[in-house]
Amino acid sequence: VVESRLFDQRIRKNMVPTQEPVLGKTAGSAFGWRIDPFTGQSALHTGLDFQADTGTPILAAAGGVVVAQEVHPAYGNMVEIDHGNQLVTRYAHASRTFVKRGDLVRRGQKIAEVGTTGRSTGPHLHFEVLVQGVPQDPQKFLHAGAAGAATGTQVATKAAAPRR
């Protein structure tokens, strides 16, 4: 039983997006309401932007299965990874992608390179975390990763809880 629980904890740790997707880069534009740089109107920014040079590696924030690898009008070259438990990460504006739909990826695996494709003002990674299809603040997951895996799992569980 103890061995089974340890295995479950290890799986959860690797499947919750707590790994920094661009190493050594601080987040620029944060999650939340801001003035859209294209329209000049207030709009919800559904992710976290990491400014980096074109070609900088983009890493999977957690293990999972690639459910989308496409060119999107707004996101440009984009990858989405399903981590189970209705938890998905999105990586947008890539110059190149190295995975395809159906690929199994591990935490920290290089999946793409930073670019400025789609609706972008310069080279960066736009990183999103979606729980049950609803955008969440990725910073909460990344901070939880710095605090420890158990906390990351708690953040994912709390984000998935039904709202009243």
Give residue spans per PLM region:
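Catalytic cores of peptidoglycan-degrading enzymes
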Residues: 19-164
